[in-house]
Amino acid sequence: MAMRSHYCGLVTEALMGQTVTLAGWVNRRRDHGGVIFIDLRDREGNVQVVCDPDRADMFKTAEGVRNEFCVQVKGLVRARPEGTTNDSLKSGRIEVLCHELNVLNPSVTPPFQMDDENLSETTRLTHRVLDLRRPYMQRNLMLRYKTAIQVRNFLDKEGFIDIETPMLGKSTPEGARDYLVPSRVHDGQFFALPQSPQLYKQMLMVAGYDRYYQITKCFRDEDLRADRQPEFTQIDCETSFLNEEEIRAIFQRMVTEVFKTQLDVDLGEFPIMTYQDAAFRFGSDKPDLRVKLEFTELTEVMKDVDFKVFSGAANMQGGRVVALRVPGGARENGGLSRGEIDAYTEFVKIYGAKGLAYIKVNELAKGRDGLQSPIVKNIHDAAIAEILKRTGAQDGDLLFFGADKTKVVNDAIGALRLKIGHSEFGRKNGLFENVWAPLWVVDFPMFEYDEDDARWVAVHHPFTSPKDGHEDLMDTDPGKCLAKAYDMVLNGWELGGGSVRIHRAEVQSKVFAALKLTPEDARAKFGYLLDALQYGAPPHGGLAFGLDRLITLMTGAESIRDVIAFPKTQRAQDLLTQAPSPVDEKQLRELHIRLRNPDAAKAA
């Protein structure tokens, strides 16, 4: 007989009265009054199997099965008795009366209960094979698969061609650290694993393929966080002869269709916000628009106040002073407690802030006397009036302040905005709206100044085109040069980022010069690109989405590791296979590598 006729989770009333053959794992075995019930599980879900003692051989086998045994069942689909249906399961109105039961493979006792929702991540990743059997992980990975299929079908209909690019390439250490692969054949030389197929896809446009995509692995040797992995999956796309707006329109439509099909969610319109506006209002280039709090700009107001923390920042080159109004934060009942304010003060220090000044607005009608804060006495009446006017403060509001270098203020108060918005207080007081909030952030700076290296560096990458009319600023004022770059943001996460690329060799050389790359360095690192651009390179641009992030958002997973089958930990380790691991001396000799501290490598 066939090993299986149907998936467990797909056995429904439509199969009533039919004989089915199922294969899967014992999720649970229950003995009720001489009748054994087995919940049989596969990737599609569970089905209840009833083992009656009338069939002695089968029943004896059923008595011996335990959780996670791999078994095969042949039986009759019938309705569950009245009062025993389970509408939470597709198969919840039927059961399978077992005629034959075969143990395909027994299981040792698992190290944890499969329905335990409080497992540590270490336990889950160490026993990942078992963890992947759990419905939570199977739902996540099935959604990932269905999303990838839909993306492929969409791009195929739009004329995009799936072309693979090399995994072993040239190291160009301009951004994050590369993962390096030593060459056995070429002593002392190294390949790099791709951080992105960026230059290959641009050269495919020069080669005339017009529209390219691939769903591919990329690698970055960087410090890991909840939304980072050393290897990650990218939906990588490039297209020729389209402008920025046309490129954005294609991929907005793609994401909109994915959410509608997979989640039945209508994302609606995508507002377009400039980078400058996003940083000014929210302190972030990926604002979470679900949080209903915004910065109030106060730099000019604070230039002549006696409170040196404010006036010092306001008069500092590159300094900024802002307020964050928290409606209801100072209410006598239901406002933020002193302990919560102290906790927020410590929180902003993580982002470089030295502290967190605040004013409680108790009674506006009393003017200065209606405000509660140790800083009020050092702020003159005109500044107080302007603070209250600009923030729109009402009785019971709490005003937090950030004053420092612009980056510190944006990072610290931006993080505080999210912390308060997502808190229990924020949700109870209407500061958070539980919706999907997409937007495009556009007009990014072309360059940012790296104080450690004392030079300008590319904000996105050095192949991004400057906005029309901004090319000359690369020579005169790089900080004011804007790029044809755009990010798709959803709920505070960057889903995808891209740009119109430079397609003229002389402009590309100009960017390299602005980055303090000598012509010799530029040719050594990127000569193949500069050469390609001279052969009639078309205007082109593209975008790359992080598939892992996209699925994390769609599933509501707490960590990106919950949507990847075999992820690395935050220490870049695979706990299942114990990678990375030492290699033997012969392998190292073949690669012309000698370890400085071999004992440390063995002990790691």
Swiss-Prot record:
Pfam families: GAD, tRNA-synt_2, tRNA_anti-codon. It is found in: Cytoplasm. Residues 198-201 are annotated as: Aspartate. Its EC number is 6.1.1.23. Homodimer. Aspartyl-tRNA synthetase with relaxed tRNA specificity since it is able to aspartylate not only its cognate tRNA(Asp) but also tRNA(Asn). Reaction proceeds in two steps: L-aspartate is first activated by ATP to form Asp-AMP and then transferred to the acceptor end of tRNA(Asp/Asn). This is Aspartate--tRNA(Asp/Asn) ligase. It comes from Paracidovorax citrulli (strain AAC00-1) (Acidovorax citrulli).
